[in-house]
Curated annotation (Swiss-Prot):
<feature type="cross-link" description="Glycyl lysine isopeptide (Lys-Gly) (interchain with G-Cter in SUMO2)">
    <location>
        <position position="834"/>
    </location>
</feature>
<dbReference type="GO" id="GO:0004402">
    <property type="term" value="F:histone acetyltransferase activity"/>
</dbReference>
<feature type="modified residue" description="N6-acetyllysine; by autocatalysis">
    <location>
        <position position="604"/>
    </location>
</feature>
<feature type="region of interest" description="Required for activation of RUNX1-2">
    <location>
        <begin position="1913"/>
        <end position="1948"/>
    </location>
</feature>
<feature type="compositionally biased region" description="Low complexity">
    <location>
        <begin position="1481"/>
        <end position="1503"/>
    </location>
</feature>
<feature type="region of interest" description="Disordered">
    <location>
        <begin position="441"/>
        <end position="464"/>
    </location>
</feature>
<feature type="binding site">
    <location>
        <begin position="654"/>
        <end position="660"/>
    </location>
    <ligand>
        <name>acetyl-CoA</name>
    </ligand>
</feature>
<dbReference type="GO" id="GO:0090398">
    <property type="term" value="P:cellular senescence"/>
</dbReference>
<feature type="modified residue" description="Phosphoserine">
    <location>
        <position position="473"/>
    </location>
</feature>
<feature type="compositionally biased region" description="Polar residues">
    <location>
        <begin position="1508"/>
        <end position="1529"/>
    </location>
</feature>
<feature type="compositionally biased region" description="Basic and acidic residues">
    <location>
        <begin position="817"/>
        <end position="836"/>
    </location>
</feature>
<dbReference type="InterPro" id="IPR016181">
    <property type="entry name" value="Acyl_CoA_acyltransferase"/>
</dbReference>
<keyword id="KW-1017">Isopeptide bond</keyword>
<dbReference type="GO" id="GO:0005829">
    <property type="term" value="C:cytosol"/>
</dbReference>
<comment type="similarity">
    <text>Belongs to the MYST (SAS/MOZ) family.</text>
</comment>
<feature type="region of interest" description="Required for activation of RUNX1-1">
    <location>
        <begin position="1"/>
        <end position="144"/>
    </location>
</feature>
<dbReference type="InterPro" id="IPR036388">
    <property type="entry name" value="WH-like_DNA-bd_sf"/>
</dbReference>
Length: 2004
């Protein structure tokens, strides 16, 4: 037949049709024309003609469909024709091929045990001659497709079994699920009715088949067949019509059958839904929705399906696995095939290929993975490939694939998104398929895959083929395949720039291209693996996106619209800008920034969870944009007040001053926030270098510009924004801290300063921070206390010179004047000075209105208001605490600046002023207690409300004060100074005035606002008291020659008259109360942080008490008698500012009637508040003063302070003095020469002002005797025991005389502690004391609460002080006995023979000191106390001198010493670790923080007291009190680091300090820190049992270094002899001189204690060890001791005592602190509150009281504190301490913590005090609760605790008021004895910080919620303080360690935060403490983790605690 068309054209057209069809398009005329014309150039007309002709010819088929014409090749008609070509001749044959036989032959021939892969079968068959003959002509894909189809059918029919990619014959005659054969059903279990089917009715059957209409007689085949009828509708059918098999028919007849219309799902029994998705079981014909199947099905299964009901169990399981394998295969298969190819390469090149695979492989795989599954692989083919390998369930290959997988799995998301390990394995296997197959098949497979992947199994098969090939026939993988694979892999790698598999040792990436720089990286960074494996990464320098190649980068740069960081620019000067990037807003940017930073940072843990952080990005700007130079990150709500968590400068910008710029900028922000800041500890090596250089330069420049005689660490902290711990460590590093005559003094090394300034002038800094260019508002207004303080410091710095002059004048005047005059002078001078300072500050503040400093000016205004509007103030405060604060800050900015000048000048004045303020606060605080509503506000202005309360409560005192101080007040007020001074005094003088009532930390912690708000009274009072303490500690600015400056110790007398603060306090308290009412409207107080208020109040109260004491002392001491240094300090503080007003001593008395306690007796008696606390507060300032100024210039003259003043001062010194005593003791060591000169005087003063401070007591038996008249009665029993222990230990520790004083301080502190304890035990006694001392104490307490209320501390202090006063009066014997015992033991343990001597010598002193300390507690800033104590402890170690300067100094020094000792003086380090043992410094730290700290650091009294008490009466009551004091003291560390930013940071800084000075030691050597924290604490506890003093000292040191918990724990430990032992052991470890040594020693300790979950018992044994260990621990103790002994030869002996126990019980010690905490709660809710109140008051208000400025932090911290220790809550320190013992902190900060500590280190103690013993550690939670309960009950914690709580309730009420939920926590916590105190603490802490209340309330619940911060606060504090230590050791953690989630863990979430903040710390700690921690806790790193993880667990723990 002739063809019409041209055959050539027809051929062309057929080609075109094929081509079009190949493109999956319909061969239309248009497409055919286009194809032919493009190929052959034929025109369209011709093509259409030829096409028409060809159709006529029949050579082309024309198909019309819906009006569209298509053309086909009749020989190859698409799908139908596809087989034709192959089959053409063979198709028929092929169709005749028995595929089942072929497959069987292949599988049998391959004979592979696991089964054969599709590939293997295909290759095998292709090798068969008959098959190759059949299919030789057909395309490979045709054979492959048919084989796959046949295999699928075989599987469906059960002939083949498929296992992953492997196929094997079904030997059981296809009884696969799928087989329809009878066998398969017959092997199924018999069917039975389901429960829901049995009861249902059956419809009447219709006897006709619905299909064939036949009956049972005749079916379709005309044969009889039974009908099956539907049970629902009755419709019937023949089984044959239904196509049922006989087996199925039999089974169905036994069931309730449903027809297809009625079928319901047997699982969900829902007929209506998803009928299309219903499967019918081949065994019972029931219906199931696919989603209702078990496991749920995503696709209709092929072949036979048996439901889960009929499926045999085993088979069911297999089915499940099979389904899982299928699903995995589905995931991996689509990707699997392509991936398989890639995988082959991958498997071959296990190294880089995974990446390569992801790169080149992905594309191919995508093509291959046409199946739906391939979609997932396309983007993540690399991942998926790996996954594929895992996905396949080949048993033999799983491990193989797994390994391959893991290598490739490291892509960023792979590990997270791989469906399952199996899936990944399968892919790995797939990868193994021969490369050739992969590569070759890519093209093929793509098509084939596209063909078969439509079927799920196809996808699997594809993979199977690859896998089969890989696994089934590996012989098939030829050498050629391998070579091909390698070749391709190399090519792929070259494209990406990867030369070979990455070397794990090599940094990846080793180079980055960043902007115009190519930077060699220093470390590896966790970039996603595909990036991190590349040798070079390309980063966009603006958005920081990372890319693989320069091309991608260039393309990105064209599109990237960024030219600066995605945030607001907050600073610009010249070409330098800083942007504040919020991690929550610009998450990706911040993550990329962290990844970039890690390339240049050794260890960094934060990469992806950047939300809680702010990133301050420094850029250098040019026309192109803002080029990244570096950045620092800070946590948004850091409890530790860390202002930097990570800092990095890119290498190309290094050594150009940018690092310093960023550090300076971070401190500028901290100052704007109104709080002292500190970098997160532990610091890295480079970080420590950078920071130490910065601190040195800043401090030297500050000293250069500050010519004050009295410069305190607190003041320095305010001026610089650097936390006291860091300052202390730096001063120590510069050798500018010395311990003289029982106090730490700052030595001005003029040559050093001048040299530095000369260098600076030669080499000007290239870039400097210009505060004027900062446009930034703090996220949170920090607690007013610290922030304002810091700002005040800055203001002071600006106006310090004028102030100094004024101060000097005032001091000189005040020296001559009586105490009242001194106090007035303090007020007036301080006011005057402060106004000057404040004025400059005001301008600064105006610029930084947001800053707390701004608040200060505002405060000054309110203070005026407060004067006239006390009530007004209160009301306002309630409403507008925050607003008022802010308003005040803004409004008073100018006045504040004036004040700032004055304030700076008259640090002493300020301190005195602070005292007055404290008095005011105290007076106000009682009302505040009454008016709990104020408490939350007080948080904002912590000092304000307490002041208000004090004003209300002791209007008379206030009036008197105001009257007295009115002279000054008029001046000050006229200058506007007074308000400012108060604020300033609070801020700066709190540090300086550890002794001044300021010890109610509010002044310091209180942001300047507080001080200003109630500047007169608060400040004056604080100033006076502080100043006295400061005078003793800091008043002395010893020139380099150590010559005493104008305010020598001898001048202490003059200075004593100077305690104008005290006289002012009494007179001014009432006066100021009036003034506060008038001058400080409520708003003012509101603005003042609660701590400030508390401080002010407590300081007022204390002042009143101190004034009384002073008056008594003055009566006795009118002649120049050496009053205890703390007294001297107090007086110095009081006097120096008050000197001009010295003539108004009566006023002071008048202001503070002896019968009337300024502070609530509770406050007075609050152990935490006791001397240690006040000392803490004042001591820091004192140390600063003494250091900058002279040792306590004011030699307490007999007539220096009236007895009231003395008693107040005694109380203050007690509270202040414990630190002052610590300082004093250390200073006495240092100033021993001076004391030799002034010794007589000071002794006289001491005796005259017996309770003035432990040191006072030691120095002046006369003074002490006087106070002891009251106090001794109650204290004598205690003192007897304490002193016995004290004396014994002192004899042991007799070498260091300062330690004796410290012992005295410890005793005093312990008395205070005991007061706290007795608040539980002797609440009745406390009541008596309250009655006896109620008026003075109330006023005192009022003062103190004012100060401390700012942090719950005020409240606690108040009640504590009241209790203290009462207890001191009545219970002093009892309380002091336990407290003293504890203190003595602690102190002795912390040990210094001096302490012992002092203890014996100071027994009376202790009594007096106790009273005095009680007040001082309030007045002392816990932080100051801590810092001083740390210093004291460390210095005590070094020379019991240098650091006793201030608590802050001590704490800082202590921490520093950990560092310094390790770095400079290993022994010192140990000393720091062993502080308590050496100086009682540790105890001091621990006890001193509350009151113990003072004693332990300054005087054996405190440690002896606490320690002695602990030893003497294991009853937890006393221990509780000491513990509490410890907590307070420790809280000073922890809480202060949280609350008291200056001090708190110091505390945290302690840890930080440790990390600063011996970051390596403390942080890197967790054991050192641990020892310090846990060791010291534990050691403390341990020591307390064997060496009460040493243990406590150690604990103090630890606590200071580590945390409140430690101290509390130590205190607890001391309380419990077992605990003491535990405590001692860690102390020994702690005593290790260098962190490393500490670590070394500590590891055992830690090990001991890490086992303590079980080893809580171990700790028990270790505690016993500690007892024997006193000598065995010397190894550890020796290290500690060595640093101590070498630094302080006398202290060493105590350290040995303490240390051996510590050493043995290093871990136990760590935990002992927790028990101490428990004991603290035991000691009494009031006691605890007192401690914490004081701590907050002292620390929070005084040093770091920043409730408002760091409102969130403070609040959180407070919450933490509240949770941690209801009593110590005011500061977050206690909580911080209990941070680790979060559960403790939760339930009862003290209690819970004690319990955890107890369990671990204090288990013995716990046992001693209660049944829950060793297991406590493991069951820390349980322990906490039982322990707490037991302890409480043992220590009167139960009912007495409740009583105390009741006693403290006012304070709590205060706090409650301050913290809205405080009262609730109080109540809630109170429900349980354990938590009873906690609530107090909570309430109190809440007061300072609103959060605290809630937290206390929820102890367990809120803990986590608020605790996030609270816990953080606590934990962070703990971490801070114990950063390396605590985390490592986590006394708490270890103890909590067995706790469900780490008792700490409640705080743990915060801890996590803390970890974040503290991340580096924890990190360093981990390195430092891995051994100890690893042993003790889980591991050092674990600690870190635990800290982080603890958050949640802690919550759990806390919850349990709460429940308990």
């Amino acid at each position: 037949m002739v063809k019409l068309a041209n055959p050539l054209y027809t051929e062309w057209i057929l080609e075109a049709i094929k081509k079009v069809k190949k493109q999956k398009q319909r061969p239309s005329e248009e497409r055919i024309c286009n194809a032919v014309s493009s190929s052959h150039g034929l025109d369209r007309k011709t093509v259409l003609e030829q096409l028409e002709l060809s159709v006529k010819d029949g050579t082309i088929l024309k198909v019309s469909n819906k009006g569209l014409n298509s053309y086909k090749d009749p020989d190859n008609p698409g799908r139908i024709a596809l087989p034709k070509p192959r089959n053409h001749g063979k198709l028929d044959n092929k169709q005749n091929v028995d595929w089942n036989k072929l497959i069987k032959r292949a599988v049998e021939g391959l004979a592979e045990s696991g089964g054969s892969t599709l590939k293997s079968i295909e290759r095998f068959l292709k090798g068969q001659k008959d098959v190759s003959a059949l299919f030789g002509g057909s395309a490979a894909s045709g054979f492959h497709q048919q084989l796959r189809l046949a295999i699928k059918r075989a599987i469906g029919h059960g002939r083949l079994l498929k296992d992953g990619p492997l196929y094997r014959l079904n030997t059981k005659a296809t009884n696969v699920d799928g087989k329809e054969s009878c066998e398969s059903l017959s092997c199924l279990p018999p069917v039975s009715l389901l429960p829901h089917e049995k009861d249902k009715p059956v419809a009447e059957p219709i006897p006709i088949c619905s299909f064939c209409l036949g009956t049972k007689e005749q079916n379709r085949e005309k044969k009889p067949e039974e009908l099956i009828s539907c049970a629902d509708c009755g419709n019937s059918g023949h089984p044959s019509c239904l196509k049922f098999s006989p087996e199925l028919t039999v089974r169905v007849k036994a069931l309730r059958w449903q027809c297809i219309e009625c079928k319901t799902c047997s699982s969900c029994r829902d007929q209506g839904k998803n009928a299309d998705n219903m499967l019918f079981c081949d065994s019972c014909d029931r219906g199931f929705h696919m989603e209702c199947c078990d496991p749920p099905l995503t696709r209709m299964p092929k072949g036979m399906w048996i439901c889960q009901i009929c499926r045999p169990r085993k088979k069911g399981r297999k089915l499940l696995q099979k389904k899982a394998a299928q699903i995995k295969r589905r995931y991996t298969n689509p990707i699997g095939r392509p991936k398989n190819r890639l995988k082959k390469q991958n498997t071959v090149s296990k190294g880089p290929f995974s990446k390569v695979r992801t790169g080149p492989g992905r594309g191919r795989k995508r093509k291959i993975t046409l199946s739906s599954q391939s979609a997932s692989s396309s983007s993540e083919e690399g991942y998926l490939e790996r996954i594929d390998g895992l996905d396949f369930c080949r048993d033999s290959n799983v491990s193989l694939k797994f390994n391959k997988k893991t290598k490739g799995l490291i892509d960023g998301l792979t590990k997270f998104f791989t469906p399952s390990p199996d899936g990944r394995k399968a892919r790995g296997e797939v990868v193994d398929y021969s490369e050739q197959y992969r590569i070759r098949k890519r093209g093929n497979r793509k098509s084939s895959t596209s063909d078969w992947p439509t079927d799920n199994q196809d996808g699997w098969d594809g993979k199977q083929e690859n896998e089969e090939r890989l696994f089934g026939s590996q012989e098939i993988m030829t050498e050629k395949d391998m070579e091909l694979f390698r070749d391709i892999q190399e090519q792929a790698l070259q494209k990406v720039g990867v030369t070979g598999p990455p070397d794990p040792q090599v940094r990846c990436p080793s180079v980055i291209e960043f902007g115009k720089y190519e930077i060699h990286t220093w470390y590896s960074s966790p970039y996603p693996q595909e990036y991190s494996r590349l040798p070079k990464l390309y980063l966009c320098e603006f958005c920081l996106k990372y890319m693989k190649s320069r091309t991608i980068l260039q393309q990105h740069m064209k599109k990237c619209g960024w030219f600066h960081p995605p945030a607001n620019e907050i600073y610009r000067k010249n070409n330098i800008s800083v942007f504040e990037v919020d991690g929550n807003v610009s998450t990706i940017y911040c993550q990329n920034l962290c990844l970039l930073a890690k390339l240049f940072l050794d260890h960094k843990t934060l990469y992806y969870d950047v939300e809680p952080f702010l990133f301050y990005v420094l850029t250098q700007n040019d026309v192109k944009g803002c080029h990244l130079v570096g950045y620092f990150s800070k946590e948004k709500h850091c409890q530790q007040k860390y202002n930097v968590s990570c800092i990095m400068i890119l290498p190309q910008y290094q050594r150009k001053g940018y690092g310093r710029f960023l550090i300076d900028f971070s401190y500028l922000l901290s100052k704007r926030e109104g709080q002292a800041g500190s970098p997160e500890k532990p610091l890295s090596d480079l970080g420590r270098l950078s920071y130490m250089a910065y601190w040195k330069s800043v401090i030297l420049e500050c000293l250069y510009h500050q010519n004050d005689k009295q410069i305190s660490i607190k003041k320095l902290s305010k001026l610089t924004g650097i936390c006291p711990q860091d300052i202390t460590s730096t001063l120590h590093h510069l050798r500018m801290l010395d311990f003289r005559s029982d106090q730490f003094v700052i030595i001005r090394r003029e040559k050093l300063i001048q040299d530095h300034m000369a260098k600076l002038q030669l080499n000007l800094r290239p870039v400097d921070v210009d505060p004027e260019c900062l446009r930034w508002t703090p996220v949170i207004v920090s607690n007013s206390v610290v922030s304002e303080e810091e700002e005040e410091e800055a203001e002071e710095g600006e106006n310090e010179e004028p102030q100094c002059q004024e101060r000097e004048l005032e001091i000189s005047v005040g020296k001559s004047v009586s105490h009242e005059n001194k106090e007035q002078d303090s007020y007036s001078v301080e006011s005057e000075k402060k106004p000057e300072v404040m004025a400059p500050v005001s301008s600064t503040r105006l610029s930084k209105q947001v800053l707390p400093h701004d608040s200060l000016p505002a405060n000054s205004q309110p203070s005026r208001r407060g004067r006239w509007g006390r009530k007004n103030r209160k009301t306002q405060e309630r409403f507008g605490d925050k607003d008022s604060k802010l308003l005040l800050e803004e409004t008073s900015s100018a006045p504040q600046e004036q004040y700032g000048e004055c304030g700076e000048k008259s640090e002493a004045t300020q301190e005195q002023y602070t005292e007055s303020e404290e008095q005011l606060v105290a007076s106000e605080e009682q009302p505040s207690q009454d008016g709990k509503p104020d408490l939350p506000k007080r948080r904002l202005s912590e000092g304000v409300e307490p002041w208000r309360g004090q004003l209300k409560k002791s209007p008379e005192a206030l009036k008197c004060r105001l009257t007295e101080g009115s002279e000054r007040l008029p001046r000050r007020y006229s200058e506007g100074d007074r308000a400012v001074l108060r604020g300033f005094s609070e801020s700066s003088e709190e540090e300086e005035e550890p002794e001044s009532p300021r010890s109610s930390s509010p002044p310091i912690l209180t942001k300047p606002t507080l001080k200003r708000k109630k500047p007169f009274l608060h400040r004056r009072r604080r100033v006076r008291k502080r100043k006295h303490h400061n005078s003793s500690v800091v008043t002395e600015t010893i020139s380099e020659t150590t010559e005493v400056l104008d305010e020598p110790f001898e001048d202490s007398d003059s200075e004593r008259p100077m305690p104008r603060l005290e006289p002012t306090f009494e007179i001014d308290e009432e006066e100021e109360e009036e003034d506060e009412n008038e001058l400080f409207p409520r708003e003012y107080f509101r603005r003042l942080s609660s701590q400030d208020v508390l401080r002010c109040q407590s300081s007022s109260k204390r002042k009143s008490k101190d004034e009384e004491e002073d008056e008594e002392s003055d009566d006795a001491d009118d002649t120049p008698i050496l009053k205890p240094v703390s007294l001297l300090r107090k007086r110095d503080v009081k006097n120096s500012p008050l000197e001009p007003d010295t003539s108004t001593p009566l006023k002071k008395k008048k202001g503070w009637p002896k019968g009337k306690s300024r502070k609530p007796i509770h406050w007075k008696k609050r152990p935490g508040r006791k001397p240690g606390f006040k000392l803490s507060r004042e001591i820091m300032p004192v140390s600063t003063q003494a250091c900058v100024i002279e040792p306590i210039v004011s030699i307490p003259k007999a007539g220096r302070k009236p007895k009231i003043q003395e008693s107040e001062e005694t109380v203050e010194p007690k509270e202040d003095m414990p630190l002052p005593e610590e300082r004093k003791e250390e200073e006495e060591m240092q100033a021993e020469a001076e004391e030799a000169e002034e010794g007589e005087e000071e002794d006289a003063a001491s005796s005259e002002v017996p309770a003035a401070s432990p040191a006072d007591s030691s120095n002046s038996p006369e003074t002490e005797t006087k106070e002891p008249e009251v106090e001794e009665e109650e204290e004598k029993p205690r003192v007897s025991e304490e002193q016995r222990q004290s004396e014994e230990e002192q004899q042991e520790l007799e070498e260091p005389e300062p330690e004796e004083e410290e012992d005295a301080a410890a005793e005093t502190a312990q008395n205070d502690d005991h007061d706290a304890d007795d608040e539980d035990d002797g609440h009745l006694e406390s009541t008596k004391k309250k009655e006896l001392e109620e008026q003075p104490t109330r006023e005192d307490v009022k003062e103190e609460p004012g100060v401390q209320e700012s942090f719950l501390d005020a409240n606690m202090q108040k009640s504590r002080e009241k209790i203290k006063d009462k207890e001191e009066t009545e219970l002093d014997s009892e309380e002091e006995q336990p407290s003293h015992d504890t203190s003595v033991v602690s102190e002795q343990m912390a040990g210094s023979e001096d302490d012992h001597e002092e203890d014996s010598h100071t027994k009376e002193e202790l009594i007096e000191l106790k009273e005095e300390e009680e007040i001082p507690h309030s007045e002392l800033d816990l932080e100051t106390v801590q810092a001083v104590q740390s210093l004291t402890q460390e210095e005590s170690s070094e020379h019991e001198g240098a650091y006793q300067d201030c608590e802050e100094t001590l704490a800082a020094c202590q921490t520093l010493q950990s560092y310094t000792q390790a770095d400079e003086d290993p022994q010192m380090s140990m000393v720091e670790d062993c502080h308590a043992s050496e100086h009682n410094s540790p105890i001091s730290s621990v006890q001193s923080h509350p009151s113990q700290s003072v004693r332990s650091v300054s005087s054996p009294n405190v440690p002896a007291l606490e320690s002695g008490y602990t030893q003497i009466s294991p009853e937890q009551g006393s221990l509780s009190a000491p513990s509490m004091q410890n907590m307070e003291t420790s809280p000073m560390m922890d809480v202060p680091s949280v609350s008291d930013h200056s001090q708190q940071v110091v505390d945290s800084g302690f840890s930080d300090l440790g990390s600063i000075e011996s970051t390596t030691e403390n942080y890197e050597n967790p054991s050192s820190y641990d020892s310090t924290m846990g060791g010291s604490i534990c050691g403390n506890s341990s020591s307390q049992s064997s060496c009460s003093y040493g243990g406590l000292s150690s604990s103090s040191s630890l606590t200071q270094s580590s945390c409140v918990v430690t101290q509390q724990m130590a205190s607890m430990g001391s309380s419990c002899s077992m605990m003491q032992q535990s405590s001692v052991q860690p102390a020994a470890n702690c005593s290790i001189k260098s962190p490393q040594s500490c670590v070394v020693e500590r590891p055992p300790s830690n090990q001991q204690q890490q086992p303590p979950p079980p080893p809580p018992q171990q700790p028990q044994p270790p505690p016993p060890q500690p007892q024997p260990a006193p000598q065995p621990p010397p190894p550890q103790q020796q290290p500690q001791q060595q640093p101590q002994p070498q630094p302080q030869q006398p202290p060493p002996p105590p350290p040995p005592q303490q240390q051996p126990p510590l050493s043995q019980c290093s871990m136990n010690n760590s935990f002992t602190p927790a028990p101490m905490i428990m004991e603290i709660p035991e000691s009494g809710s009031t006691g605890n509150i007192s401690i914490y109140e004081r701590i907050p008051g002292d620390f929070g208000a005084g040093s770091y009281s920043q409730p408002s400025a760091t409102f969130s932090l403070a609040k959180l911290q407070q919450l933490t504190n509240t949770i941690m220790d209801p009593h110590a809550m005011p500061y977050s320190h206690s909580p911080a301490v209990t941070s680790y013992a979060t559960s403790v902190s939760l339930s009862n900060t003290g209690l819970a913590q004690l319990a955890p500590s107890h369990p671990l280190a204090g288990t013995p103690q716990a046992q001693a005090t209660m049944t829950p013993p060793p297991n406590l550690a493991s069951t820390t939670m349980n322990l906490t609760s039982p322990l707490l309960q037991c302890n409480m009950s043992a220590t009167n914690i139960g009912i007495p605790h409740t009583q105390r709580l009741q006693g403290q309730m006012p304070v709590k009420g205060h706090i409650s008021i301050r913290s809205k939920s405080a009262p609730l926590p109080s109540a809630a916590a109170h429900q349980q004895q354990l938590y009873g105190r906690s609530p107090s603490a909570v309430a109190m802490q809440a007061g300072p910080r609103a959060l605290a209340v809630q937290r206390g309330m929820n102890m367990g619940v809120n803990l986590m919620p608020t605790p996030a911060y609270n816990v953080n606060s606590m934990n962070m504090n703990t971490l801070n303080a114990m950063n390396s230590y605590r985390m490592t050791q986590p006394m708490m953690n270890s103890s909590y360690h067995s706790n469900p989630a780490y008792m700490n863990q409640t705080a743990q979430y915060p801890m996590q935060m803390q970890m974040g903040m503290m991340g580096s710390q924890a990190y360093t700690q981990q390195p430092m403490q891995p051994n100890p921690h690893g042993n003790m806790m889980y591991t050092g790193p674990s600690h870190h983790s635990y800290m982080n993880a603890a958050g949640v667990p802690k919550q759990s723990l806390n919850g349990p605690y709460m429940r308990r």
